[in-house]
């Protein structure tokens, strides 16, 4: 059994890829149980399943209820905030609120919410700003911490976080790829910073990672997305590999599908870059996460 203990704070277990479905087509058998088993083998103790819309949050919760190690978040991702306006925005918000309020213990965070100005083709800036701010009603009423998303929107994101400082009880900005200054400003607001493969692409990213106090860090995979690619600056620090096939085969990872077991690779990069003992860092990351989401 692994010496390491992990909480994967961002895992998209409701993604059809873990059921063998790609773009609506069944390509291989449902292997979710194998994916979970591989993660447990390397030390994942809790999985925080990300909710990215009202329906997605319902699906995440439903899956979370099938396993004691599974938990979920409730919120609306910035690229999907136009869903608020497909019917009544107040009704949509009320749906999110009742889901979070009625399932405490399984629902551990409000999110994924925030701003994403890299993908405005999915949802315009004004809509994102309006409904990110609206979701502080959820954090305020439930007193749950936040699971946050910030892409190419640091100034506006910080403005909103500062303005609503007394309406949230903490949280994490996941999949962080911002600057040292951005990280420091978020830490000043009492927030934690989550790292995954997308956070470790460039040498500049690695410099940012070095600058953040370990007691403000968390770890995640964002699987099936955000795997570490061989072109990423962080990849040279990976020691652990998994039997992987280009075409699906039982008992193997699949080449272009990230999995929660790969969290060990994120730890290896983080500990090497920061020159910290992997076990010590893993324990710090685990304790940070328990403190924010599970105590």
From Swiss-Prot:
Molecular function terms from GO: metal ion binding; nuclease activity
PROSITE patterns, per the entry: TATD_3 (PS01091)
GO cellular component: nucleoplasm
Sequence positions that bind a divalent metal cation 2: 112, 149, 174
Family note: Belongs to the metallo-dependent hydrolases superfamily. TatD-type hydrolase family.
Role of this protein: Deoxyribonuclease which catalyzes (in vitro) the decatenation of kinetoplast DNA, which are circular DNA catenated to each other, producing linear DNA molecules. Plays an important role in chromosomal segregation and cell cycle progression during eye development probably via its DNA decatenation activity.
Origin: domain of life: Eukaryota
Subcellular location, record wording: Nucleus
Residue positions where N6-succinyllysine is found in the record: 27, 46
Co-factor: note: Binds 2 divalent metal cations per subunit.
Binding site for a divalent metal cation 1: 112, 222
One Pfam family it belongs to: TatD_DNase
The protein's Enzyme Commission number: 3.1.21.-
Cofactor(s) the record lists: a divalent metal cation
UniProt source species: Mus musculus (Mouse)
Protein name in the entry: Deoxyribonuclease TATDN1
Gene3D superfamilies in the record: Metal-dependent hydrolases (3.20.20.140)
InterPro entries the UniProt entry points to: DNase_TatD-rel_CS, Metal_Hydrolase, TatD-like, TatD-type_Hydrolase
Keywords: Hydrolase, Metal-binding, Nuclease, Nucleus
